Amino acid sequence: GYVNGWNAAEETLEANREAGEFDSSAGAIRNVTHNGCGHILHDLFWQNMSPEGGDEPAGALADRIAEDFGSYDAWKGEFEAAAGAAGGWALLVYDSFSNQLRNVVVDKHDQGALWGSHPILALDVWEHSYYHDYGPARGDFISA
């Protein structure tokens, strides 16, 4: 899994540093990035999932969505469009560079992220997430 891959890559990097040999470091760094991002995004996705979930946000998050997107419905429409176009993930992130919430597409775990952004919500739209229950109807999964 992602954690094992991440840990193995970290061990390789540590051994390379100690030995002063860096031939395998580039691959290990890619594995840290891929497995680390895969683990973090899946962890956030599972935290977002709840049998009681699905309601509109309240409080500061709701206020910020209204400020940055105009309304919850506008945010939701844009988020669903991002998820429909994504090869891997749609994320609601806080972009600290522009000080606003954004919907972003991340086609692979480690590609498409916006530097300085902090993920708030993640939707896994890889086929393994929906195909068993929804078949090819990815849009139905996104709307659920």
From Swiss-Prot:
Binding site for Mn(2+): 42, 124, 128
Coiled-coil region list: none
First-level EC class: oxidoreductase
Cofactor field: Mn(2+)
Alphabetized UniProt keyword annotations: Manganese, Metal-binding, Oxidoreductase
Cofactor note: Binds 1 Mn(2+) ion per subunit.
InterPro entries according to UniProt: Fe/Mn_Superoxide_Dismutase, Mn/Fe_SOD, Mn/Fe_SOD_BS, Mn/Fe_SOD_C, Mn/Fe_SOD_N, Mn/Fe_SOD_N_sf, SOD_C_sf
Protein EC: 1.15.1.1
Reaction(s) this enzyme catalyzes, per UniProt: 2 superoxide + 2 H(+) = H2O2 + O2
Entries under Gene3D superfamilies matching the protein: Fe,Mn superoxide dismutase (SOD) domain, Iron/manganese superoxide dismutase, C-terminal domain
MF terms in GO: metal ion binding; superoxide dismutase activity
Main function: Destroys superoxide anion radicals which are normally produced within the cells and which are toxic to biological systems.
Family assignment from sequence similarity: Belongs to the iron/manganese superoxide dismutase family.
Protein name as catalogued: Superoxide dismutase [Mn] 1
Gene: sod1
